[in-house]
Amino acid sequence: MCSIVILKQSDSEWPIIIGANRDEMQNREALPPGRHWEDRPHVFAGKDLTAGGTWIGINDFGVVAAIMNRMNSLGPMKNKRSRGELVLDALDHADASESLNAIIEIEKDSYRGFNMFIADNLNAYWIKSDEKNSLIEYFNIPDGISIITAYDRNDLNSKRIKTYLSKFALSSEPKPGRDEWQDWEMLLGSTYSDDNNPLSAMCVKTEMGFQTVSSTMIALPSFQPKVGSSKPIYRYANGSPDKVSFADMTI
């Protein structure tokens, strides 16, 4: 996964809303979200059929986790474990703080560099494992819009973030209780880039087969939601989001 957009609103009926695009080689097969792991029946996520892990998912406690590569760490490496395992590990816990504590205790050198997002309806974290740094770092995600790619959170050195941070900030925020997602659907499916580089777009399309292969939107309700909005909402586009519509998933 290469991009995750986070809207954190601590006092809202929906304190966490995320939109995430998975950028991958088109021929890397995956299953759409489901309960694919017999030893983890509490996990609902898409399954990468190459390595067996996942790029984003939710558990029955309302914890969401997602992972992205850091710069210059695309793809597997000999003697390194799959980073998709880490999402499953995070989703073994009952709240985001427990998940965070588990991830920061991993053997860092067993994995290539990554950015990770973990949240529940109270807390949200960005975890950074840079191959140039001996430590795993973590940060609280503040209220407002955040975008994480292979770069740091809201890092304007990322041309994608530089282009789309303001677009998401100025867009009409999703209203999950009313099933209103239009602006975010449009932005997640946008192939526009300021520099005409397809890799700088939110929705990636290249001639070499590397592209946005799916898109996910998740909303977490507060502890005291209004009638009709007590469960997380999970929406999924099984393909490029400029072509494939989002469908509501039954968790």
Residue ranges with predicted function:
Residues 1-251:
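N-terminal nucleophile
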